[in-house]
Amino acid sequence: MRSHYCGGINESHIDQEVTLCGWVHRRRDHGGVIFLDLRDRDGMSQVVVDPDTPESFALAEKVRSEFVIKVTGRVRRRPAGTENNNMPTGQVELLGKELVILNAAATPPFPLDEHVDVGEDVRLRYRFVDLRRPEMINRLRFRSRVTSYIRNFLDSRGFMDVETPILTRATPEGARDYLVPSRTHEGSFFALPQSPQLFKQLLMVSGVDRYYQIAKCFRDEDLRADRQPEFTQVDIEASFIDEETLMGLNEEMIRSLFKDVLDVELPEFPRMPYSEAMQRYGSDKPDLRIPLELQDVGDLVESVDFKVFAGPAKDPKGRVAALRVPKGAELTRKQIDDYTRFVGIYGAKGLAYIKVNELTKGAEGLQSPIVKFLGDDVALAIMERVGAEDGDIVFFGADKATVVNEALGALRIKVGHDLNMLTCEWAPMWVVDFPMFEELPDGNLTAIHHPFTAPSCSPEDLAADPANALSRAYDMVLNGTELGGGSIRIHDEKMQEAVFRILGIGEEEARAKFGFLLDALKFGCPPHGGLAFGLDRLVMLMTGSSSIRDVIAFPKTQSATCLMTQAPGEVDEKQLKELHIRLRRSAKAVEGNKAENKE
């Protein structure tokens, strides 16, 4: 039907006859000559239709934005002075001699110009129109290129692309499962996989040795800018391998991907223990582009009369930390109030601060309502510890360590961006030596990653002191975003049972939920490990998009709905009956029916 894409004609095609197909991006009538900007996924070409071809000219008068047309004509150089150097095709135009309207179009719900700001709800409602925009189609093309590169890289390293089931059973992996009722097994449900975790481990038991999959995963959780109920991950697993080899392989893949696709030379990835990341940055995924760090000052304030600081300083689970912001004394009262409200989102009860006006004057050179409560000596000791200089501001967090880390860690990121403090464009890293477990509010332990992560100690040492055990887990972080996480897995049945016991999973429950895994561990399971990347998140970062919704063809909203298809939707009574399901109506629906009956 066509000989070339719209973005593919140039000066080498002058005097050639070509056929283009696409959407009319813009129509202009200039004194009896009609200009059409014709667009497809590869770009745009200018088509000229003049009265010398009366039939085509009559059709050109009828076309409007987003009409689908086919044009055959001769490529010619644009007249001097009318070239468009901003377009790859801007030196030439197509003199149309035969035009066919393939389909008319209703008026689009929004203009398709890149600079037009359109509400996301409208874009998602008409996603099939939104995806025609060059920036959107370019993101999909970019994603395809990234996926293709990853496949080729892993293929070349001996990995096999193996598909794992979508209909499986519910397993505790940290989020709620999406459940699928079984028609043939009354009262039973499949679950959509949160990850292929157990299946890829079983593939290692099966001798596959090196596996990968571009896998769809599903998690019924509250959504954020970088979360979707269904998402895509690059899933990797290998046998007879240690964490050093796995991290090296995946680092090589990401660095070579950035070089090939973006022509960016990423530096080698530094490694940082989890405890150090939390201590210095308040986060297990620190953004190393921002040169701000948290510093402990609890030992300096535990004896002061200021209970706001002294209380957390004496609490074994508390923390008092300072965040020095160079030149931050210029912040206005309103800005500080805004930051105070911001840290409140993370549970902080306030945001104490000290402005450093002139250190040579001692405590008199410090500006803050808390200096008098700390005492001059303590205030100056804090300034010395954090390396404060004239013109700085020092923020403080004093609370449970978890609250201080979250609040000051988030403030560090916000201030760094607000004050344009980023020192580089890309800052990758590995976070290693994660704890095996974390304590829940009720005092029980839960796995930080998942219960199949291998500890770095023996089963006996693990049982003796599980709260302080470290795991053989590792996370890849880029610009403060977790790109992927992985670990060496448990390949010994006794170790797996020991972990289950610590998590409060008894023998009967373990057998009911993971019997197939425990059986597999008895039949010669090799040492193995792996890692999974969030493909959506990776493409979001590489394209500079603000949300993964911008790099997914048909995403869900933050309330987990599809505005285009109106999913999720109700199903009819017949389908429910076949699935042996009866819906319990909400109180709101019952009240509505009562009101209708009264009428």
Curated annotation (Swiss-Prot):
Domain of life (superkingdom): Bacteria
Record-listed ATP binding positions: 219-221, 228, 482, 534-537
Chief subcellular location: cytoplasm
Molecular function (GO) terms for this protein are: aspartate-tRNA ligase activity; aspartate-tRNA(Asn) ligase activity; ATP binding; nucleic acid binding
Reactions that this protein is recorded to catalyse: tRNA(Asx) + L-aspartate + ATP = L-aspartyl-tRNA(Asx) + AMP + diphosphate
The Enzyme Commission number assigned here is 6.1.1.23
Instruction: Write the record's keywords in alphabetical order, separated by commas.
Output: Aminoacyl-tRNA synthetase, ATP-binding, Cytoplasm, Ligase, Nucleotide-binding, Protein biosynthesis
Main EC class the enzyme belongs to: ligase
Question: What positions are marked as the site Important for tRNA non-discrimination?
Answer: 30, 81
Q: What is this protein called?
A: Aspartate--tRNA(Asp/Asn) ligase
Q: Which gene encodes it?
A: aspS
